[in-house]
Amino acid sequence: MMRQSVQTVLPESTGNNTLSLRDSVCRDLFQLFSSPHSPLPILLVSGMPEWQGHNQSDKLLQSWYCRQLRSALLFHEPRIAALQVNLKEAYCYELAISLEMMLYHDDEPLTFDLVWQKGSWHRTMPQ
């Protein structure tokens, strides 16, 4: 009987898989928000045009947005075990959100902040 050997290349271990998991999730979340071909509903990633004007202080609209965004993100990012979406600011042409999450296989909470300005999303550092 003849044996064949198959060579495989294993990914390099950085020694800190948690860090790479966190970086990967943040990178993929930012891609979900900023990609023109995002699977997220356009209403959730377009900075909520309804707020451009008189609705930015509408608490029901803000609550609806947070629930819809949370549901969509949990559907598209299976590495998130728990997620809370918070609106930090909602102005006419600016929207700031904070995603507070727990990842599977990670014991520390992860915060990911985004701001919608000038027609696109920008990542900010948590305070």
Curated annotation (Swiss-Prot):
Family in the record: Belongs to the GpW/Gp25 family. IraD subfamily.
One GO-annotated biological process of the protein: DNA damage response
Domain of life: Bacteria
UniProt keyword annotations, A-Z: Cytoplasm, Stress response
Molecular function terms, GO-annotated: anti-sigma factor antagonist activity
InterPro entries referenced in this protein's UniProt entry, alphabetically: Anti-adapt_IraD, IraD/Gp25-like
Main location: cytoplasm
Entry-linked SUPFAM superfamilies: gpW/gp25-like
Gene Ontology CC terms, in alphabetical order: cytoplasm
HAMAP family, A to Z: IraD
Oligomeric form and interacting partners: Interacts with RssB.
Protein name: Anti-adapter protein IraD
Cellular location(s): Cytoplasm
Biological role stated in the UniProt entry: Inhibits RpoS proteolysis by regulating RssB activity, thereby increasing the stability of the sigma stress factor RpoS during oxidative stress. Its effect on RpoS stability is due to its interaction with RssB, which probably blocks the interaction of RssB with RpoS, and the consequent delivery of the RssB-RpoS complex to the ClpXP protein degradation pathway.
